[in-house]
């Protein structure tokens, strides 16, 4: 019997395909988790980094 309160989740098909490929490549869920955590980008980016310095003189 299902709960009265059910949640519906829509899966992102691209993520599903990536996870299937990772599984086929024998990449563990823990390895994926670590990769995502290490490469997580902030929702609020800091000041833009300069690729070079500007010398006005």
From Swiss-Prot:
Spell out the InterPro entries in the cross-references: SinR/SinI_dimer_dom, SinR/SinI_dimer_dom_sf
Main role? Acts as an antagonist to SinR. SinI prevents SinR from binding to its target sequence on the gene for AprE.
The protein here is known as: Protein SinI
Q: Which SUPFAM superfamilies match?
A: SinR repressor dimerisation domain-like
- Listed GO biological process terms: regulation of DNA-templated transcription
Q: How does it assemble?
A: Heterodimer with SinR.
Where is each Sin domain found?
A: 2-40
Return one GO MF term: protein dimerization activity
Please give the start and end residues of each transmembrane region. Answer: none
């Amino acid at each position: 019997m299902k709960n009265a309160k059910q949640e519906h989740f829509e899966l992102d098909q691209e993520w599903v395909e990536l996870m299937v490929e990772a599984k086929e490549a024998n990449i563990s869920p823990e390895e994926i988790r670590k990769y995502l955590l290490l490469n997580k980008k902030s929702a609020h980016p800091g000041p833009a980094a300069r690729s070079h310095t500007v010398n006005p003189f």
